[in-house]
Amino acid sequence: MDKFRIQGPTQLIGEVTIAGAKNSALPILFATLLAEEPVNIHNVPKLKDIDTAIQLISQLGAKVKYNKSVYVDASNIAVYCAPYDLVKTMRASIWALGPLVARFGQGQVSLPGGCAIGARPVDLHLDGLAKLGATITLEKGYVKAYIKGRLRGAHIVMDKVSVGATVTVMSAATLAQGITIIDNAALEPEIVDTANFLITLGANIIGAGSNQIIIDGVTSLGGGEYRVLPDRIETGTFLVAAAISRGHIVCHATRPNMLDAVIAKLRETGAKIETGEDWISLNIHGKRPKAITVRTAPYPGFPTDMQAQFSLLNLIAKGTSVITETIFENRFMHIPELMRMGVHAKIENNTIICHGVEKLSGAQVMATDLRASASLVLAGCIAEGVTIVDRIYHIDRGYDCIENKLRNLGANIERIYS
């Protein structure tokens, strides 16, 4: 497996262009299965998960061309089963099920894989499809959905806020007969982006971005062009990189209004942040950041996908702080690895007590999931000596050319190919 070798410490200074959002691009790619005409999707990030999604929809019979944009023609889908060999690496594969059963009356998806960060069951997805009229069964590791005729609109109240399940129900409901109301829907910008894509294809959706989404089903969806919104988590990751390295980074091609909670917390550290319509600048003027309290929450609260990066920030900051994770269990696997580099932390249930240290030491560490791997790479950039980050296939799942972008900011980082 590939590794990163990082020589630190480095003050990261410069400019970076933010890629398209993984958490928009993936549901949008799977939603192309609903379209009877070709679709062009722009600003798609170059990620391992994107490659997997493209392979999957190609195996189902879609014609796909992937260059700077992704062209999908799903007019001749002939296979309705997403196989284990692809699904095992990516939990997002469950998003194929809703479009398949909505358009073709049947679909099968192997129980999905992805990051090992606790219980993220697909029950909410399946409950939503069942309420739309689909018969759901589990056979030999595959989830199967079936219906005679069209799905039927329904009033669905989500038991808990779930981005993934909101996407599944919203996408499937676009082709259902009648009106579907989703209450307690997720509010994330990526939900709005997916809804806007579906609207481009001819769907009738109102309320995306609020806790109630209303979909008036249509008989078919056409084609169109769409541009994926910028990745707010990649943006936040590079802003943290500037803060922990006592540097200055400007992020371009992003949207500051999607990052209010992250920006507010970074300002608490003492960093100076400036924003424009499509850029954010963080300059901490060579100072050590101040420790801050962080509690993850569904959007518009502090994103769980930024928790690992802010854990690192607090562990090198001035003072003692507490980070509370409310979204996922078992999402502190980066902490034992950071301890190998000299941090002082104590895990108590769903909280981390962080005692900031002034310096980190390079070490050999192992990535355990996507966002944890980002925190380890950033730690290597500011640690004294050499850091080796193993199992970086995790970071390739969610960050577009991260080593090139860090290198352009001054990091001494190289990929060691296996």
Swiss-Prot record:
<keyword id="KW-0963">Cytoplasm</keyword>
<feature type="binding site">
    <location>
        <begin position="22"/>
        <end position="23"/>
    </location>
    <ligand>
        <name>phosphoenolpyruvate</name>
    </ligand>
</feature>
<comment type="function">
    <text>Cell wall formation. Adds enolpyruvyl to UDP-N-acetylglucosamine.</text>
</comment>
<keyword id="KW-0808">Transferase</keyword>
<dbReference type="GO" id="GO:0071555">
    <property type="term" value="P:cell wall organization"/>
</dbReference>
<dbReference type="GO" id="GO:0051301">
    <property type="term" value="P:cell division"/>
</dbReference>
<comment type="similarity">
    <text>Belongs to the EPSP synthase family. MurA subfamily.</text>
</comment>
<keyword id="KW-0961">Cell wall biogenesis/degradation</keyword>
<protein>
    <recommendedName>
        <fullName>UDP-N-acetylglucosamine 1-carboxyvinyltransferase</fullName>
        <ecNumber>2.5.1.7</ecNumber>
    </recommendedName>
</protein>
<dbReference type="InterPro" id="IPR001986">
    <property type="entry name" value="Enolpyruvate_Tfrase_dom"/>
</dbReference>
<dbReference type="InterPro" id="IPR050068">
    <property type="entry name" value="MurA_subfamily"/>
</dbReference>
<dbReference type="GO" id="GO:0008760">
    <property type="term" value="F:UDP-N-acetylglucosamine 1-carboxyvinyltransferase activity"/>
</dbReference>
<feature type="binding site">
    <location>
        <position position="91"/>
    </location>
    <ligand>
        <name>UDP-N-acetyl-alpha-D-glucosamine</name>
    </ligand>
</feature>
<feature type="binding site">
    <location>
        <begin position="120"/>
        <end position="124"/>
    </location>
    <ligand>
        <name>UDP-N-acetyl-alpha-D-glucosamine</name>
    </ligand>
</feature>
<dbReference type="GO" id="GO:0005737">
    <property type="term" value="C:cytoplasm"/>
</dbReference>
<keyword id="KW-0133">Cell shape</keyword>
<dbReference type="GO" id="GO:0009252">
    <property type="term" value="P:peptidoglycan biosynthetic process"/>
</dbReference>
<feature type="active site" description="Proton donor">
    <location>
        <position position="115"/>
    </location>
</feature>
<dbReference type="InterPro" id="IPR005750">
    <property type="entry name" value="UDP_GlcNAc_COvinyl_MurA"/>
</dbReference>
<feature type="binding site">
    <location>
        <position position="305"/>
    </location>
    <ligand>
        <name>UDP-N-acetyl-alpha-D-glucosamine</name>
    </ligand>
</feature>
<keyword id="KW-0670">Pyruvate</keyword>
<dbReference type="GO" id="GO:0008360">
    <property type="term" value="P:regulation of cell shape"/>
</dbReference>
<feature type="binding site">
    <location>
        <position position="327"/>
    </location>
    <ligand>
        <name>UDP-N-acetyl-alpha-D-glucosamine</name>
    </ligand>
</feature>
<dbReference type="Pfam" id="PF00275">
    <property type="entry name" value="EPSP_synthase"/>
</dbReference>
<dbReference type="InterPro" id="IPR036968">
    <property type="entry name" value="Enolpyruvate_Tfrase_sf"/>
</dbReference>
<comment type="pathway">
    <text>Cell wall biogenesis; peptidoglycan biosynthesis.</text>
</comment>
<feature type="binding site">
    <location>
        <begin position="160"/>
        <end position="163"/>
    </location>
    <ligand>
        <name>UDP-N-acetyl-alpha-D-glucosamine</name>
    </ligand>
</feature>
<keyword id="KW-0132">Cell division</keyword>
<feature type="modified residue" description="2-(S-cysteinyl)pyruvic acid O-phosphothioketal">
    <location>
        <position position="115"/>
    </location>
</feature>
<keyword id="KW-0573">Peptidoglycan synthesis</keyword>
<dbReference type="InterPro" id="IPR013792">
    <property type="entry name" value="RNA3'P_cycl/enolpyr_Trfase_a/b"/>
</dbReference>
<keyword id="KW-0131">Cell cycle</keyword>
<dbReference type="GO" id="GO:0019277">
    <property type="term" value="P:UDP-N-acetylgalactosamine biosynthetic process"/>
</dbReference>
